[in-house]
């Protein structure tokens, strides 16, 4: 990946950190599009998979923590895992997925507790 790609990724991180989720999301969507199609093999494929894991993790965080959009976040976290990332990125994606599952279970329990029809 070239220097522009890395600069754009850093811009997305900075926008996310500043709470500008729309800009961060726009940049990450564009970056993920640039990573398609996935090369068939070799070092270039490994580099694309590594970047895809980083960008998808950031996109998942933007969706989950920025927009409270767990369904979109879940698909991005799954993309991280499908990229066979290093352990730290895998663990962060798994934490995001666990947070989504936990939040869904809390909503289900809350709904069942307040719905006497069940």
Model-derived features: where do they sit?
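Alpha-helical linker/edge segments of TPR/alpha-solenoid repeat scaffolds
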Residues: 50-68, 97-118
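Flexible helix-coil transition and linker loops at the boundaries of alpha-helical arrays
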Residues: 34-49, 66, 83-90
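Inward-facing hydrophobic residues that define packing positions of alpha-helical scaffold repeats
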Residues: 9, 16, 28-31, 35, ...
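Structural signature of alpha-solenoid helical repeat junctions
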Residues: 3, 44-52, 69-72, 89-92, ...
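Residue-level signature for tetratricopeptide repeat
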Residues: 10, 14, 18, 62-63, ...
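Short coil/turn linking the two alpha-helices of tandem helical-hairpin repeats
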Residues: 13, 17-20, 39, 64-68, ...
């Amino acid at each position: 990946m070239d220097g522009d790609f890395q600069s754009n990724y850093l811009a997305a991180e900075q926008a996310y950190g500043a709470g500008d989720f729309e800009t961060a999301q726009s940049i990450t969507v564009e970056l993920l599009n640039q990573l398609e199609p996935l090369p068939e093999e070799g070092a270039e494929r490994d580099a694309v998979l590594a970047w895809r894991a980083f960008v998808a993790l950031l996109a998942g965080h933007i969706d989950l923590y920025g927009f409270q959009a767990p369904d979109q976040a879940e698909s991005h976290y799954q993309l991280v895992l499908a990229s066979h990332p290093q352990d730290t990125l895998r663990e962060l994606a798994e934490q995001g997925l666990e947070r989504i599952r936990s939040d869904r279970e809390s909503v289900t329990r809350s709904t069942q507790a307040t719905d006497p029809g069940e």
